[in-house]
């Protein structure tokens, strides 16, 4: 008998988790949903029955003892507070926030890349990577295995759903506020008032913001999104000295993160070799032109526009474009795939 819990079940990613649990016929005999007091008591239909959402603030170690796996997508603060409680009760926690990713005693797993790290549990917690890192890893791991990755230069173009419901609502409201005046931006960027900037530094509608995430106060002038890309790539690939430079950009797209990747390798690797490798890679779909709209709603990372990097000698560099659904594989799906590894 397997019992699974979804913490943050009523949120944006939690909703996708619930859908995927049903779609994939996850082998759980009992499912429990948890959320904040605001959503507690709400009834959610799941597999033909209604399940009442439980108040996470009322959870005790005793009340959680039947749970085998707990899927967390309730934010870092809630994860720090409640994930250890679930683990102490005997559950293995798979956490979607950034709370545990840098902890040396918590494995950071992409199911297609480093699944065996699930056997290295110390705290009973497994971390899910950031959605931008997630899109890149299934693509980069097989290329690394073939040629030895040594350096990455990445620009990411991240959808507003990566900022949560606030990001989605802000873009929708700004587009509506500008209305038919949008073409006036051709000649004047101040021609129309988009209204409240929401979680962003400037209007996101009809704009591109080269500032995704929050500025890290460490003198690097990087955002936390850019540092996550570096730190998480190193940890997942087992390359602590990997050189990674990234610029994370927020774009007016609802779902789907896109990355342009300049990858340098220790050994030569041609475009044809890369295409053959990626065509056979798990969690990857080779396409001509990856786009966020094409990626939205599918499981795989789309990869295309593969070229030789002319700035790297001896055919040791590749340029490629990756698009991935930041809510699906970038958050919910990988969490569930890890849980599937745990209950096999």
UniProtKB/Swiss-Prot annotation:
Keywords linked to the UniProt accession: Amino-acid biosynthesis, Diaminopimelate biosynthesis, Lysine biosynthesis, Methionine biosynthesis, NADP, Oxidoreductase, Threonine biosynthesis
Transferase among keywords: no
Binding site for phosphate: 101, 228
Pathway stated in the Swiss-Prot or TrEMBL entry: Amino-acid biosynthesis; L-lysine biosynthesis via DAP pathway; (S)-tetrahydrodipicolinate from L-aspartate: step 2/4; Amino-acid biosynthesis; L-methionine biosynthesis via de novo pathway; L-homoserine from L-aspartate: step 2/3; Amino-acid biosynthesis; L-threonine biosynthesis; L-threonine from L-aspartate: step 2/5
Leader sequence segment: none
Residues reported to bind NADP(+): 10-13, 38-39, 161-162, 326
CDD domains documented for this protein: ASADH_C_bac_euk_like, VcASADH2_like_N
Catalytic activity: L-aspartate 4-semialdehyde + phosphate + NADP(+) = 4-phospho-L-aspartate + NADPH + H(+)
Domain of life (superkingdom): Bacteria
Assigned EC number: 1.2.1.11
Residues at the catalytic site: 131, 257
Keyword Amino-acid biosynthesis: yes
Disulfide feature: none
BP term (GO), one: threonine biosynthetic process
Described purpose of this protein according to its UniProt entry: Catalyzes the NADPH-dependent formation of L-aspartate-semialdehyde (L-ASA) by the reductive dephosphorylation of L-aspartyl-4-phosphate.
Subunit composition and interactions: Homodimer.
Family: Belongs to the aspartate-semialdehyde dehydrogenase family.
Protein known as: Aspartate-semialdehyde dehydrogenase
Native source organism of the sequence: Corynebacterium melassecola
